[in-house]
Amino acid sequence: MKLIKSTLFISLSLIAAKGFAQYTDVINSNRPGASRSAFSVGTNVLQFEAGPYFINEKRTPAPSYEVEGFGVDFAARYGLLWEQLELNVEGTFQSDTKTYTSTIDAEDKRANFKFLTVGAKYLVFDPYKNAEEDKPNLYSWKANHKFKWKHLIPAVSVYAGVNYDTDKNPYTAVGIEGFSPKVMIATQNNFAGGFVFITNFIKDRIGTDQSDFQYILTLTHSFSPKWVIFAETQGIKSDFYADNLFRFGGAYLLSENFQLDTAMTLNTKDTPSVFGVNFGMSYRLDFHQDPYKEIDNGTSAKDEGQRRSRRNKNKKGDSDLINSKQKRETVDFN
């Protein structure tokens, strides 16, 4: 019973910390999904997220082909100046072999960045800020898990970044090279019971022939202080590529600053079909310090002078009272 209470207390504390502040006592990673949290890593926190993956794509209708290879997703995130601000570098590098399955098979070995982006994210609205009444109730499981309408109001952040695409990149449309802007709106709802719902709405490579729109919906559930599972759907729409991807996976908190994760990606079409598996890790260098708040404990020179003045007045009053008593006692009535 004590173990259950301790586990419940730790879980609620972590959920509360994640809900009411940018900085959290444990690492807050975007992995292993593709969505981005509305919250930053916290000021003076440098965080690295990376993971290799294996990919298989197969197109059945003509022109038919099959892709097999591997890649790595990576990100570096840093909280700068304010709790709401995060600077980040993100990208995916892939190396594969594309085999055209026609009368005469032909192979095309490819390797390049699928995307490489530098940007900044800023939290513009935080409904959980200063929400004292939403802190966990250590005496009521029901109170901690009941639905509250205000939880439907999400935290909202905005993102702006710049893509860089190299010339003759096999993973982009013909003629896509150089720099192009990327913008995103991210929302996050922290529900009771360890559920978190994240949405991303993205406009990528704006102003190019491959300007696509994406949405990502992610639901995560933390069922213990160490384990979390997630399900995610991602829609991509552009003239170059369109797809609906689904991801499932989980993560394990190895320590306060180190997380391991894995996920599976698939879709439901054959132009091409997609199947991928990834394994990853997230690690942070935590130099965060809570902002200093000056506490008035009455030790200023002015306060000390006022206290001494009051003490002197009290001493003088006591002295006058004693002298008065002594005078009354020495009166001669004879």
PLM ranges: what are they?
Residues 1-6:
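Positively charged n-region of N-terminal signal peptides that target proteins for export
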Residues 7-15:
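Bacterial N-terminal signal peptides
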Residues 15-21:
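Sec/Tat signal peptide C-region and signal peptidase I cleavage site
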Residues 22-206, 210-263, 267-334:
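Transmembrane beta-barrel domains of Gram-negative outer membranes and organellar outer membranes
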